[in-house]
A protein has these predicted regions:
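Non-transmembrane, aqueous-exposed alpha-helical and coiled segments at domain scale
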Residues: 1-416, 481, 502, 506
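Short, basic, low-complexity termini and linkers enriched in Ser/Thr/Gly/Pro
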Residues: 406, 410-437, 578
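Feature captures the catalytic cores and cofactor-binding loops of soluble hydro-lyases/lyases
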Residues: 303, 309-383, 438-572
Length: 578
């Protein structure tokens, strides 16, 4: 790859340690993706702000960047939602020690880098945020919304890779930045009428749950959705893309919304009234919720207005109701009198935070009700591990005000015994036994920034993707995800072999925390390039290799003693004979 003078200066450290680390990471990702050039970006959006998600790994990494006085972002960069509303912290009743102080520390560290502290997961709703051209955005809902409805072109960046691009001003030219890779690969035909934004949220999430192992979708499912009205509201479109992003959808097309690239369909799905009602039935609360949360992603002005109208003349007395929004939208809501309506009812209107990144106090929050499948997806995960139900907005408000009560037609939820739900659906795989005798060598590639190495160690193997955020214990390296074939097993100190990571774009910070606590894998081997594992490995020198044949996962099994060796650009791995 030919570098320009600016890029060579960054690589040589002439613009400081932070940009040197960042350009190395960008070049590693470029090489891994077979990108032949770097292209300038117009904007960046960073995930990894709440101590709940970024954790110790994020805080220590930001402290490392702070040691460089030249560390500054090179393009307009916005910040994702934080873990609390600092001004209403006491009202949120967060019991996690030092959470407020750590939140302030993280936001201040980003601000020193020149990041605009918007603390919003909806940058596309801000008037002066660039939503056109090449970009490096993390935060899955923002990626899908921007790619689908605006002129933005961004890959599904991790928090670390987006930060590296923000510091350098460049990103590798590959993936969804190439129009040839933005074609729809799945057709979804909707045969029922959808109206409430929650209907669209359920549709988006449902699409992701249908994914099959046979689908060839290197950049995730990109559905073409037919059968929807041509005049969808902002809130309906937002709910659709936010939930579709739960399972890695970076972009979608609406059939009646203008030109699109030629389709290359892998499958055809039908979503009708039966599917919609089945999801509502499965998601409805079986017992009274402890808390109702609205605004995931953060509520637009239209959503705030809808909540305020539902609350007019009512009092929130039965179940606490929290409405989450951005500081920009809250300011507008104050001017329109909507904020007063919400507060007068007894509900909270919170800013700068989002339901999925709050550490709820389990002594009183035992069951959450929401109108968002994005909130449901993450709140029930290992981040909080709370039973989460879903209903339409009007139903949520009616329960909060006591107009509707939950029928006890099934036993009450018991959170202490509730399993952590899997974010990966219909897994049919398991820890695979060895199927070959003797020694077989597999070949892959390594990161350009890492030199030659030879390691031997115990293998940890699974043929299912690993969701680091929420499903890997940060203190032990143990996978804690019911239904995952490696549930209960630790990666710490082992050569971890798996297809790739999945889930949140904040995942690299979990891997960094494992490294800082000395419970990270000895090395990571992926059959596919992993945008979640590779950035952390690049920055801290954890040996990383990718691009191996899938048969590797069938030949080596957990507990085998293996050797991984890098010579030049090639990495080999083999099972050592007993």
């Amino acid at each position: 790859m030919q570098l320009n003078d600016e890029q060579r200066a960054m690589l040589a450290g002439e613009q400081g340690l932070a940009r040197q680390m960042a350009i190395r990471l960008v070049l590693d990702l470029a090489a891994a993706a077979n990108a032949t050039k770097l292209i300038p970006i117009q904007s960046a959006h960073l995930s990894g702000v709440s101590p709940l998600t970024g954790g110790l790994g994020l805080r220590l990494f930001l402290q490392k960047l702070a040691q460089d006085p030249l560390a500054q972002v090179a393009v307009p960069t916005t910040l994702n939602a934080a873990g609390c509303d600092l001004e209403q912290f006491d009202l949120m009743r967060i019991a996690l020690p030092d959470f407020k102080a750590h939140s302030e520390e993280i936001v201040a560290a980003y601000t020193r880098l020149g990041v605009r502290p918007t603390q919003s997961c909806t940058p596309y709703e801000w008037e002066d945020v660039v939503v056109t051209g090449h970009a490096a955005w993390a935060e899955s809902n923002a990626i899908c919304f921007g790619n689908s409805y605006t002129g933005l072109l961004t890959n599904r960046e991790s928090g670390l890779s987006a930060l590296a691009s923000a510091l350098t001003g460049y990103t590798p030219s590959y993936g969804l930045l190439d129009e040839a890779n933005r074609h729809p690969n799945l057709v979804v035909i909707v045969t029922t009428k959808l109206s409430d934004p929650t209907d669209f949220s359920i549709l988006g999430d449902w699409i992701g749950t249908q994914r099959k192992a046979s689908w060839k979708m290197p950049y995730g499912p990109i559905p073409l959705i037919k059968g929807l009205p041509a005049d969808l509201s902002h809130e309906q479109k937002k709910a659709l893309t936010a939930a579709a992003a739960n399972y890695g959808c970076p972009l979608l097309y609406l059939d009646n919304a203008g030109p699109r690239p030629p389709a290359q369909f892998e499958d055809r799905l039908m979503f009708g009234e039966r599917e919609l009602q089945a999801r509502y039935e499965a998601l409805r609360p079986r017992s009274a919720p402890s808390l109702i949360v609205i605004g995931c992603p953060q509520a637009s002005v239209g959503e705030i207005k809808a909540v305020a109208e539902q609350l007019r003349g009512q009092q929130v007395e039965t179940v606490p109701l929290w409405v989450f929004t951005s500081s920009q939208n809250k300011t507008i809501a104050e001017k329109l009198g909507l904020a007063d309506l919400i507060r007068q009812s007894g509900a909270l209107l919170l800013e700068n935070t989002c339901p999925e990144v709050v550490p709820y106090d389990p002594t009183w929050v035992k069951h959450i009700l929401t109108n968002s499948m994005k909130a449901e997806h993450y709140i029930k995960s290992g981040l909080n591990g709370l039973p989460t139900s879903v209903m339409r907005l009007a139903d949520c408000v009616a329960i909060a005000t006591g107009q509707v009560s939950i029928r006890h037609d099934q036993p009450d939820v018991k959170p202490a015994a509730a399993p952590k739900k899997s974010s990966i659906v219909n897994r049919q795989s398991s820890i695979l036994p060895a199927t070959a005798s003797g020694v077989e060598t597999f070949r892959g590639s390594g990161l350009p920034s890492q030199g030659d190495f030879t390691l031997t160690g115990e293998a940890f193997v699974t043929d299912a993707p690993i969701t680091f955020l929420g499903f890997v214990n940060r203190d032990t390296g143990v996978i804690e995800e019911e239904g995952h074939p490696a549930n209960g097993q630790s990666m710490a100190g082992k050569i971890a072999i798996f297809p790739k990571g999945s889930g949140s774009t904040v995942a690299p910070y979990v891997l960094l925390e494992l490294y800082y606590k000395a419970v990270a894998p000895l090395a990571i081997v992926n059959t596919e390039l992993d945008q979640q594992s590779a950035p952390a490995c690049s920055l801290e020198g954890i040996p990383y290799a990718y691009g191996f044949a899938p048969e590797l996962l069938q030949t080596i099994r957990s507990g085998d003693w293996v050797e991984i060796q890098r010579r030049g650009e090639q990495v080999t791995i083999r099972r050592l004979e007993d």
